[in-house]
Every structure is written in C-alpha cells, then in structure tokens.
Amino acid sequence: MKRSLMLFPKLLFIGLTCAVTLGVYGQQSGSVKRIYISTKGSDRNQGTIDSPYATADAALRSVEKYKNGKNTPGIEIIFMAGTYQLDKPIQMSAVVSGTTTHPLRIKSADGAKVILSGAKSLDLKWQEGDHGIWAAKVPRGTNFQSLYANDKHLVRARYPNYDPTVLPFQGYAADALSPERVATWKNPKGGIVHALHAGRWGGFHYEITGKDGLSTVTLEGGQQNNRPSKMHETYRFVENIFEELDTFQEWYLDEQEATLYFMPAKGINPNQLKFVAPQLENLINLSGSSSNPVHDIEVSGLCFMYTAPTFMKTAEPLLRSDWTIYRQGALMIEGAENCTFRANDFIELGGNAIFVNKYNRGLKIEGNRIEQVGAGAINFVGDPEAVRSPSFRYEKFVPFDQMDTIKGPRTNNYPKDCEASDNLIHNIGLIEKQVAGVQVSMAESLRILHNTIYNVPRAGINVGDGTWGGHEIAYNDVFNTVLETSDHGAFNSWGRDRFWHPNRKEMDELTTKHPNLILLDAIKTTKIHDNRFRCDHGWDIDLDDGSSNYEIYNNLCLSGGLKLREGFYRKVYNNVMINNGFHPHVWFQHSHDVFRNNIVMQSHQDIQVKYWGEEVDHNIYGLQGDLEKDQAKGIEKDGRVIQLNFTNPAHGDFRLKNWKDQGFKNFDMLHFGVISKRLKTLSASPEIPQPIQSLAKEQGGRWTWKSGLFKSVETLGEQSAAGLPSVNGVLLLQLDEKSNLYRSGLRVGDVVLNYQGEKIDQLIDLQQAIKKHVHADKPKVLIFRNQQQQELTLQL
C-alpha cells in the first residue's frame, strides 16, 4: 500500500496511534505465572487479573520473589489497557531474567492499548491576557522542554514561526540572532539556538546564557557535532524566547515566574484541554554486564511515548566519525543477552528511541514502529575502551610508533550478533540532525534487515567506523533521506580507523609501508545487498573516508548512485543505478577495489583518481558515449552497451527483460522493507523515477594561469571529494611542479576560496580578482586542503 508522504509534520494527532496487540502470542500453558498491572490497581494487591498491581516495580519484585533463585516455569507481566505515567524508568536487572525455554515476557493484554508515558499531567487554571495569550501558574521548580495539549505537540515560542513545509527546521532565518532582533528580547536567558553545521554536516544546539550589551547574546553548547565549525549563517532559528510568542499553538514557560503562557487557536479555551509535559528521558532500562547479563526477556505490544528532549546532552564523540552521541533512549539496553523487543511503538519522543549500549549479545529488535522522534531511532554503540588506539576527532591520530597493532577489539564491551529487522522508521531527527534510522558504531556482526526508513534529516543507515565489521545490511527500503543536511547518503559510512590519517600524503605512506594496518579494525566483511536506496540530496550509497572491507551487491539505487571515497577492499557488483552511476573519489594506489557487472546510466564520475583498483570493468551502459568516456581513462575494456529494456520500471521493477544472466544477474526488486502485515499497511514507498538516458553533464570551463589549470567546483561529487561545506570555490586540476604556484605551496586538488580578500565562488571570480589585484606580487590566497582552510602567500 502506497501512502502519501509528509516531511516532518509536528502538530500531529497521536492519541489513537499506538499499537493494539491482537493476540500476538497464543495462550500459554496453565503453568505460566501471570502478573497483571492496571492503572486502577494497587501495589498492595496480589498481582492477579482481579487484584492487579499499579506499577511495573511491584510486578518485577513479585517476579524476583517468585523465582527466588529457583528454576521456574514461564512468567508473564501483563499490562492492562491504559496510559501509565511513569515517575521513574522501569528498571530490569539480571535477577528477573528468564531462560531460553521460558523467557520473562512483558506485554500488553490481548487487544489492549498500553502507553508508557514519560510525561506528567499539568493542573492548570488559565486566564486570558492580551494579544490572545493565556497564562497559568505552575508549581515552583517546574521545567520542561516540550508540551502537548490533547495529544497534539505544541510549538515552543520561536523565530521564525513553525512551517511544516519548510526544511530545515520547519523554518529558518539568517537574522535569527541579528542585533535588531536581540535588542527586542528583554531576558532571553534559557533560549535555544538551533543551527546547521556550516557545511550542513548535521546540526548544533546552543543555550542562551544572557545578553552582552543590548544586542548580542552569550551562548554555550554546540558540542553536538564531532566536526566543529561555526553555525550556518542562514539555516538557524531560536526558540524559548517570550517575545517570539506570536502565533497559534506556541507556548513559553517562564521558570522564574512559574508561569506558562500559551496562544491557542481562535475560539479555543485552554481550560478545556489536557496538558502533559515530558519529564523522563528513559522509560525501560535493562541493565546488566558481560559477567552478569540480563537475559531472556521479551517486551512486546507496548507504546513508548513522551520522553524529554536530550539534545543539549549530545556530546560524546564517536571515534573519528562526524557524530557525537548521548547514551540514552526511551528503551535503554546494556549488558543484555538473548532479549527480544517486538511489535512495540515508539512515538513522540524527545531523544533517541532505542539505545543498545556497550556489551550486548543476541538481541532482536523487530516489528517495531518508530516515528516522531527528536533524535535517532535504533542505535548500536560500543565502548571506545574496547577499541585499540582510538582517536576522537577527524584531525587526531595515533602515531605509528605508539599504535597498538594487535588485530580486533581490546575488550568485549560492544554489541555483537544483534538484529534490527522489520522495523518501520520515519520522521525522526525532528530536533537533532546528526541521527540515523539505524546507527552503528563500535559493533560487530549486526543484522539490519527488512527495515523501511524514510523522512530523515541525514542517513537512513549509518556505520560510523570500521570497528569491527561483519554486518549484514539487506532487504531494507531507505528513501527520502538527507532532507535537511548535505554531502551524505541514504546509506553512509566512515572508516577512519587505525590506518587512517587526516593528511593524505602521510596516509598513503603509512598504508604502503604497513598494509597490515588496513584491516586491523574492519576485521570482518560487511555485506550490503538486496536493498533499495534513494537519496536525492547526496548518494544512494556513500562509503566515505576510509570505509573498507565491504561487499556490495544486488542493490537498487534510484537516484544518487554509488560513491566510494578512499578505502580498501570494496567489492561492488550486480547493482543497478537508475539515472546515475559510479562515483570513485581519491582512491589509494593499492586499494584492491572491484567494480564490475553493474548497470550504470552515466559515465563514471571519478575525482582525483590516478589508480583504478583491482578491477573496474565488465559494467553495462545505456549509452555508447558514456562507455567511450570511461574507456578513454584506460578502464572498462570489456564494458558493454545494451538497450536497457526494464521489466516494469513504472512499478520499480528494473530487471532486464529476456536477460540471459551474462555477467549481471537479475535480482528480486519487489520485496524491500518491512514484512509484517501491521507495518506494511502503515508504510510508504519511494517515488519511482522514470529512466532517462542522459549524457553526463558537460565539463565546465577550464582556465590556465601560471602553469596551473583551474575550474569551478560545480558538482556535489567535487564538493565531497574536497570536503567542502558547499559547492563553491575554484579547483586546481593540474600544476607544473616547477612553477611559482607550486613553490608557493599550491597543490593539485586545492580549492581556492579567497584571493587577496576577494571571495571566490567560481572561476570568473578568480579571474576578476587577479585582474583587480594585478599589481600584488605576493597575493594572499585562502585554500581548502585536507578538509581545512589554509592561507598561502603566492610568490608570483
């Protein structure tokens, strides 16, 4: 069933959206111990269906007492219908563990809608004031970051106003912090600034700590991205400012005055509405260790709702990836074995939905619905102490003579042999922008299967590092990705592992001299196969810095093609790239990369590739001109051109008609994404593109100056290869090593951003700047190299 897509609607009725479990499990034998919980129960009761407990704490104490160290038959904790407003998370330790044959089951009653809520109800007496703004007193000490009225998410007073049709942030403004606007704020302390990274590589969040004079604010925060930069000059907004409360559905909490302000829609009396405010970050917590794990527990049929936003706590760097993280989620799992989380709903959450933290083995996260989430959906994150010679920023590295060169992990404190399958994930990253549907960092042998992921600000699936590989990523349907950021993919990975160095020259020397370093961390091959990916704002599959030891086959790429930046041992075959193709960037001399038997619809878009790996050949083209362009590069000797006669492209079936399996082999293109009936009826599908046989874009103008060949940065590929924050600047393509420019420090691959104080966006800017400053014999230029700005003085 194809459903219409909305991008990030936040004002959403969610009161009746949680799962209703309809006999997920059959009746158990009479020996099963059943413990009941009801919103009308009491912890002084017996826990029976006629005398239920009121809390999960009481039920878990009953489990512990019943077990008392003995082997027992199966135990079920059954929530009866209702909303359970928790005042603290439900904690489960090893003492309540089940067994392989009799797991502890925590579930909703058959047919019951059960909500675990992290919010508290607000008892408010509203009084109408000026300009349509109502006010109500709250108890001293009350604080919250999000608010709901009759199950509708309300908007914290903000500028610019919320617009669900605008990305990013549902509204942004370059003047959000302008002196003129700041001057109108009497006391902005506690306000929040949300902004994209200058390169749109995720986002930042800052708290306003006060004013410096009349028209400037002071800020703290901005630690939510592991690639520090200034905030984006345009993509930013402010919230939690009283003076910005100026439109319907906005609210503002004055903590000093203990007063809540709200502007309802015309004709609405807020005294007739039910208000709740999220308080808890976590609703269920499984906590064990490798020596004493929580094990054999199943959680099903519950709806996790209303957790508090956690964006100001996102600060821990995940090795040298672009991410920082906050280790928390509505469902938090650490030190668990053989536990299953099935057919639950995670809706209207302020932070992460599910966090699998450090040591975990044999977990299954399956059949869940995850939507309207402030941060990420499913996160598998290990302990950096398990990594040998870790580094924690792009520009950091461990010198070889200090490096631990033992292969593999240092400890077992990371997720391994876990599965995330058949999950429906969409409309996440509503607050934080460096998030993913499934995030993997410092983990091994995960199975990410049959998930449907869409409407995300960045990647649908992200693998942050090579430690320790062995993942299977298959049968997923991932689309509407990278909607609010840039230079990324529907699938994205980094591999800044032990061999990787921020200076390319040093990395080349290191990997040539010590090739054994390459797979010290990525010890197992990660397989990406039989997925459907679509990214209209980047690449469908993006293996970025250092990503190594991958096998990629049988994937249908609908828009952005496939990119391999520098890395090793990538075998890519039998993929279909609609209206796009292959993007190799800055390859190593001995990469051992293979790209063969794929269908491409444009010539290879290589950038700074001198060496073509082990094999780039036997690929299938739709146009003779594209093949000839690639053959002129010394590759694709046995490439072929055929008529791309697809079976049923309008319905996404891009198998070749009457194909005899000559090299390329047809594969199933009709069964991606979720498989459970419940989720299939709720899921959307990607827009299927019409195949267009188009020539690759004509290369832009080139200009020779002082023995150097220059051109404008014109494509996303050129931007990504250089690590630029935007498609701007002038790229140096060729340079005579005997020239003055070379002696002045310029190198091939440098991007000129500024010449003698003149901003350089394209080639004509550089030409005009040189003419303007023709008398300057030592002009200063600002260049971009190794993803950093450098200033050089040219000796002309």
Regions found by a protein language model. Give the residues of each.
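Right-handed parallel beta-helix
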Residues: 295-306, 337-351, 361-375, 387-406, ...
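Short glycine/acidic-rich loop motifs that flank beta-strands on beta-rich extracellular proteins
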Residues: 88-89, 281, 308-314, 350-356, ...
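Predominantly extracellular beta-rich ligand-binding scaffolds that present long acidic/polar faces
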Residues: 87-94, 101, 105, 549-651
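Extracellular polysaccharide-degrading/modifying enzymes targeting complex plant/algal/animal polysaccharides
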Residues: 32-335, 340-345, 386-410, 652-656, ...
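Extracellular beta-strand solenoid repeats
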Residues: 78, 85, 91, 105-107, ...
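Bacterial Sec-dependent N-terminal signal peptides
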Residues: 1-32
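Beta-propeller domains
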Residues: 223-230, 239-240, 266-292, 305-308, ...
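C-terminal recognition in membrane/secretory proteostasis and scaffolding
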Residues: 686-796
